[in-house]
Amino acid sequence: MDIFINRFPSIDLHGYDRDSARVRVMDFVTEALIMGEDGVVIVHGNGEGILKKEVHSFLKTDKRVKRFYVDAFNPGCTVVIFK
């Protein structure tokens, strides 16, 4: 667990539908890697978990992702660490 996640850039997906969120996350991850970031924070919210499931589904298949986890202090966020 990284208690200093505020050092990572973040994206807030509130208001996005599933498909738009997936595209936005793909672009955000690509941009972060180009900028040399070690990781990012994705804010998907709690709700019904639709965006969270979509984000995690994408992250599981992205070979650039070393690992990801739900933030212990805010379960509406996923922390992503790059390879």
Regions found by a protein language model. Give the residues of each.
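Long, charged, low-complexity intrinsically disordered regions
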Residues: 1-83
